[in-house]
Amino acid sequence: MDQIEHITINTNGIKMHIASVGTGPVVLLLHGFPELWYSWRHQLLYLSSVGYRAIAPDLRGYGDTDSPASPTSYTALHIVGDLVGALDELGIEKVFLVGHDWGAIIAWYFCLFRPDRIKALVNLSVQFIPRNPAIPFIEGFRTAFGDDFYMCRFQVPGEAEEDFASIDTAQLFKTSLCNRSSAPPCLPKEIGFRAIPPPENLPSWLTEEDINYYAAKFKQTGFTGALNYYRAFDLTWELTAPWTGAQIQVPVKFIVGDSDLTYHFPGAKEYIHNGGFKKDVPLLEEVVVVKDACHFINQERPQEINAHIHDFINKF
């Protein structure tokens, strides 16, 4: 990890922290919730060893990157704006893009807004979500899963923060990263995050050192910036009306664990495998379903994910 360089740049009105290693064509890695650049530690080291420059920012609201106060500052347009500005600041014209969880959502929007900056995309866990002009995102999730669904619970500023503050931060990360349930996460108001059982032991792919890194950073920053992505999701829906029906026009490989909760959302498998996904993403070249893998697949199965990323981007 010592070879990873940590830089801070100005972009789109914020200061952004980026982990960077290697030389060659650039691979931009976008983390999810509740994560950091650190989630890509295995991919950063691997990609740099096979001839790429791998860069992984702390996204807006996370880690050592600035965290604007207003939830309205966290739309996909803001986040993609940060990333375009970062590439400009670093003198990078085009990248291979890799996203996971919220990073995957941002990656889909990056490809919608600025396909000219993307050579190819490898996305993990979250398939493309076509915009339904009649139903905002959170309303759709509320209809499908009810008020206790975690995205719905995260909407009111301060509520989730209060819940998280009542739990040891390291314990919270153990519970989040090790949750192997494929059921939609529901957080009843009276119980909150304690509704998800903590693991008895850490899995082999996660160490106490890893947990402590996440916990230390989030103790410094709190969770508000990260939660604001959910609070701005419907504003993103509103502002992206011009892209209703637009297709993703970059080459794509999609990877998901067969035990990933996102893969078990109602309609997800049908959309991914029965033609809907390919219609919205016409340059979708491959869908990989990884057996016995859960949501944090880039950390749980790093060697497989490294190989899948390299095999795809090596074609271009």
From Swiss-Prot:
Active-site residues from the entry: 101 (nucleophile), 230 (proton donor), 295 (proton acceptor)
A Pfam family this chain is assigned to: Abhydrolase_1
InterPro entries, per database record: AB_hydrolase_1, AB_hydrolase_fold, Epox_hydrolase-like
Pathway as given in its UniProt record: Secondary metabolite biosynthesis; terpenoid biosynthesis
Keyword set, alphabetical order: Hydrolase
Leading EC class: hydrolase
Catalytic reactions of this protein: an epoxide + H2O = an ethanediol; (24S)-24,25-epoxycucurbitadienol + H2O = (24R)-24,25-dihydroxycucurbitadienol
Site positions per UniProt: Contributes to the formation of an oxyanion binding site for the epoxide oxygen of substrate: 150, 230
Keyword Hydrolase: yes
Documented EC number(s): 3.3.2.10, 3.3.2.-
Expressed in which tissues: Highly expressed in young fruits 15 days after anthesis (15-DAA).
One Gene Ontology MF term: hydrolase activity
Residues given in the record as an epoxide binding sites: 150
AB hydrolase-1 domain segment(s): 25-302
Role: Epoxide hydrolase involved in the biosynthesis of cucurbitacin and mogroside tetracyclic triterpene natural products (e.g. siamenoside I and mogrosides IV, V and VI). Cucurbitacins have cytotoxic properties and exhibit deterrent taste as a defense barrier against herbivores. Mogrosides are nonsugar highly oxygenated compounds used as high-intensity zero-calorie sweeteners; they also possess pharmacological properties such as regulating immunity, lowering blood sugar and lipid levels, protecting the liver, and acting as antioxidants and antitumor agents.
Family statement drawn from the similarity comment of this UniProt entry: Belongs to the AB hydrolase superfamily. Epoxide hydrolase family.
PANTHER family found in the cross-reference section: EPOXIDE HYDROLASE (PTHR43329)
Note, other: Mogrosides, the major active constituents of S.grosvenorii fruits, are a mixture of cucurbitane-type triterpenoid glycosides that have been proven to be powerful and zero-caloric sweeteners and can hence be used as a sucrose substitute for diabetic and obese patients.
Subunit structure: Homodimer.
Name used for this protein in its record: Epoxide hydrolase 3
Taxon lineage: Eukaryota, Viridiplantae, Streptophyta, Embryophyta, Tracheophyta
